[in-house]
C-alpha cells in the first residue's frame, strides 16, 4: 500500500465534471517502411497485452479524504487501451479536433486513472497516440518519462514494457495509516518551521516572486471555465532558442517565457484588455522525489513583461525574476517544497470547490511548464516519433495553460484553453512565434 502525498490528494480532490484534472499528450508517428496494413492494429493488440504501466497505473484511489491510498488492482486492457480512427484521409485539423474531445472527457475516478488511444486514418503514412492520466497519478516530468519508457532509440526494438511493482498484501492497514499520520505530522511541523523562516525574506527585495503573485492582474484568461477544451500548437527550433539565450546570457526557458509574454501583450492589445500591470506565469520547478511522491514539482511566479514593449528588456526582466525564483526554491528541502506547493495550491483548490475561484484575484495568470523528452529520435515498434504535443489541465480562474516539450531539435508548445471562454486561441500560438522572431532580430547581431 502506498499513500497519496498531500499534493497528490489535493489534485484528486480538485476533480470536477467541468474541470477534469488529467494531463496528457498526443504523439504523431511515421509508419515504418514496408509496414503491413495491419501494423496499427497489431501494435494495438501488442500494447493491450503488455503490463507496461507501472505504479500507480495499476491502482485505484481508496480510503477516506484525510488519508487516501493506492489500492492495487488488475487493469482491464480493453477499457484503458483503445483504437480510434479518423475518416480517411484524416488531416492534422481532424486529429486536433478528436484530441480536444478526448481531453475534454473526465477519467473514471473508480478505475486506474489513465487511458491510451491509438489513432489511425491519418494521411502521409502516419498514425497518432493520445495518452492521458490524472494529475494525482503523474506530474509532467513523470508523464514524459513514462512515455519515454515505451519508446527506444532503436528502430528495431519492440514496445518497452516495464514490470509492475507489487505492493503485497501482507500489511496491517490500520498500522500503516497510523504510522503515516505520525510521519506526516512530523514532516508538517518541520516544513512549516522552515517555510516561516524563508517566506519573510522571499517577500523582500527586487524580483520577488511572492510580490509578483500579489500584483497579478485579472485578464480574459482568468474566468470560470467549462469542460470543453481547445488546443493550439507552436513549434520553435531549439538551435535558434539557444542562440538567443547565449547572446543575452539567459536560459532557453527565459527566452520562451519572453516570447509568450510578447504574444500575450499583442493578443490582449487586440482585445482591448491589456492591463497596466504585467501578466505573470507560474513556473514549475522539479525537486527530488521519494517512492511515495507522484507530483514532485513546486513553482514560483514570474512576470511575463507584458507591460514592456522592447523584447530584450522584457527578456532581461523575466530572467532576473526566474534566476531568483529558482534559487529560492532549490534552497528548500524536498519536504518544505512539497508543503510549499500545497500551500500555494490550497486557495485554488478551496476556490474551485466553493465556486469562488472565478471571481477572487488570481495568484498568476497561467502556468508555463517545460520538460524534455529526448535529444535523439525515438521509435515505437519501428515507427519514428515525428512530434509530441503536451496538454495540461484547466480550472476556474485559470483558463489557459502552456506546456512545452523538447524533442530532438525543436520545442513544441501546447496551448490549452477553455473552448467557450478564450477566443481565437490559435492566434496566441501564432503570436508566440512572431514574438520570438522579433526577440531574435533584436538580440542577435
UniProtKB/Swiss-Prot annotation:
GO terms for cellular component: plasma membrane. Belongs to the long-chain O-acyltransferase family. This is Putative diacyglycerol O-acyltransferase Rv2285. The active site is at 135 (proton acceptor). It holds the Pfam family WS_DGAT_C. SUPFAM superfamilies: CoA-dependent acyltransferases. GO terms for molecular function: diacylglycerol O-acyltransferase activity; O-acyltransferase activity. The lineage of its organism: Bacteria, Bacillati, Actinomycetota, Actinomycetes, Mycobacteriales. Keywords: Acyltransferase, Glycerol metabolism, Lipid biosynthesis, Lipid metabolism, Transferase. The keyword Aminoacyl-tRNA synthetase does not apply. It comes from the Bacteria. Its EC number is 2.3.1.20. InterPro entries: Acyl_transf_WS/DGAT, O-acyltransferase_WSD1-like, O-acyltransferase_WSD1_C, O-acyltransferase_WSD1_N. Catalyzes the terminal and only committed step in triacylglycerol synthesis by using diacylglycerol and fatty acyl CoA as substrates. Required for storage lipid synthesis. Upon expression in E.coli functions weakly as a triacylglycerol synthase, making triacylglycerol (TG) from diolein and long-chain fatty acyl-CoA. Has very weak wax synthase activity, incorporating palmityl alcohol into wax esters in the presence of palmitoyl-CoA. Induction: A possible member of the dormancy regulon. Induced in response to reduced oxygen tension (hypoxia) and low levels of nitric oxide (NO). It is hoped that this regulon will give insight into the latent, or dormant phase of infection. Pathway: Glycerolipid metabolism; triacylglycerol biosynthesis. The keyword Acyltransferase applies. GO terms for biological process: biological process involved in interaction with host; glycerol metabolic process; glycerolipid biosynthetic process; response to hypoxia; response to nitric oxide; triglyceride biosynthetic process. It catalyses: an acyl-CoA + a 1,2-diacyl-sn-glycerol = a triacyl-sn-glycerol + CoA; di-(9Z)-octadecenoylglycerol + (9Z)-octadecenoyl-CoA = 1,2,3-tri-(9Z-octadecenoyl)-glycerol + CoA.
Amino acid at each position: 500500500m502506498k499513500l497519496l502525498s498531500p499534493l497528490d490528494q489535493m489534485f484528486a480532490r480538485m476533480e470536477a465534471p467541468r474541470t477534469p484534472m488529467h494531463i496528457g499528450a498526443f504523439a504523431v508517428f511515421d509508419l515504418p517502411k514496408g509496414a503491413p496494413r495491419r501494423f496499427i492494429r497489431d501494435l494495438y493488440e501488442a500494447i493491450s497485452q503488455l503490463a507496461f504501466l507501472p505504479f500507480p497505473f495499476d491502482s485505484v484511489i481508496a480510503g477516506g479524504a484525510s488519508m487516501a491510498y493506492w489500492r492495487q488492482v488488475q487493469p482491464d486492457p480493453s477499457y484503458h487501451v483503445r483504437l480510434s480512427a479518423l475518416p480517411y484521409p484524416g488531416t492534422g485539423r481532424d486529429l486536433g479536433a478528436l484530441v480536444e474531445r478526448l481531453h475534454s472527457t473526465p477519467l473514471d475516478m473508480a478505475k486506474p486513472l489513465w487511458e491510451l488511444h491509438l489513432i489511425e486514418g491519418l494521411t502521409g503514412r502516419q498514425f497518432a497516440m493520445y495518452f492521458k492520466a490524472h494529475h494525482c497519478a503523474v506530474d509532467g516530468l513523470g508523464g514524459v518519462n513514462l512515455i519515454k519508457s515505451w519508446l527506444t532509440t532503436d528502430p528495431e526494438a519492440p514496445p518497452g514494457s516495464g514490470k509492475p511493482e507489487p505492493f503485497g498484501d501482507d500489511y496491517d492497514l490500520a498500522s500503516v495509516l497510523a504510522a503515516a499520520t505520525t510521519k506526516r505530522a512530523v514532516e508538517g511541523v518541520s516544513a512549516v518551521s522552515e517555510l516561516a523562516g524563508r517566506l519573510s525574506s522571499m517577500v523582500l527585495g527586487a524580483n520577488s516572486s511572492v510580490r509578483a503573485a500579489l500584483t497579478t492582474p485579472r485578464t480574459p484568461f482568468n474566468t470560470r471555465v467549462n469542460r470543453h477544451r481547445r488546443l493550439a500548437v507552436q513549434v520553435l527550433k531549439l538551435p535558434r532558442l539557444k542562440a538567443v539565450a547565449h547572446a543575452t546570457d539567459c536560459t532557453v526557458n527565459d527566452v520562451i517565457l519572453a516570447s509568450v509574454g510578447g504574444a500575450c501583450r499583442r493578443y490582449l492589445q487586440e482585445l482591448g484588455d491589456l492591463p497596466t500591470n504585467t501578466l505573470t506565469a507560474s513556473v514549475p520547478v522539479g525537486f527530488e522525489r521519494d517512492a511515495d511522491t507522484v507530483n514532485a514539482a513546486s513553482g514560483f511566479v514570474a512576470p511575463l513583461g507584458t507591460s514592456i514593449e522592447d523584447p530584450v528588456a522584457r527578456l532581461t526582466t523575466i530572467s532576473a525574476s526566474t534566476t531568483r525564483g529558482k534559487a529560492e526554491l532549490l534552497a528548500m528541502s524536498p519536504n518544505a517544497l512539497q508543503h510549499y506547493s500545497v500551500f500555494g495550491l490550497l486557495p485554488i483548490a478551496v476556490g474551485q470547490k466553493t465556486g469562488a475561484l472565478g471571481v477572487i484575484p488570481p495568484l498568476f495568470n497561467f502556468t508555463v511548464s517545460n520538460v524534455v523528452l529526448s535529444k535523439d529520435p525515438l521509435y515505437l515498434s519501428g515507427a519514428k516519433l515525428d512530434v509530441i504535443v503536451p496538454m495540461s489541465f484547466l480550472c476556474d480562474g485559470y483558463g489557459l495553460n502552456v506546456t512545452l516539450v523538447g524533442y530532438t531539435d525543436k520545442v513544441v508548445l501546447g496551448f490549452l484553453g477553455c473552448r467557450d471562454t478564450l477566443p481565437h486561441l490559435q492566434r496566441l500560438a501564432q503570436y508566440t512565434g512572431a514574438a520570438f522572431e522579433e526577440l531574435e532580430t533584436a538580440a542577435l547581431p
